[in-house]
């Protein structure tokens, strides 16, 4: 994973990357990472999120069948805005200020589904996320081609980006990858990899997981069923 992550990091220009068993698995692992950070105790408690940041804000027009992967972590989706433009009743959709207004001390992340019709514009949502210190997860599963999108969302300020490996990349259908902030990729990896090892003997690649910042190793994480 560390070697593959280095390749993903190079092609996406993100801090780090990680191979997953599809974009939905990337959504699940990314959400878990945003909820727990690098806290093994929180990792062990998922999907019980009592006492944690356990809400993910999503524009109402971004809801889709795949957001079940987000909810599977144990978080609640907080829908904001009204998508009048899709109902034919008007021209408005969710606006960035509505996302900001929904942020509380329970907000773990903001979910954003990238496509040509997505609203509000990603840059506006990134401004909100950075102002409030809330990570944004971009689902870019079907946003290839163009190849430039491999770098676009990270360059715009997304904390995590999920891609499918089974569409235009033409890899196995059960493949994908997650890229973004190094600390969040590490948190995702910790909840995905086999943890059946003694902490004192465990020697993960530091480029993927910095053992020195951990009080101990978590148990098998919520993402273990998504192993590759």
Model-derived segments and their meaning:
Residues 5, 13-19, 23-228:
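Conserved PLP-enzyme active-site core in the AAT-like
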Residues 1-2:
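A glycine-/small-polar-enriched, mobile loop at the entrance of the PLP active site in fold-type I
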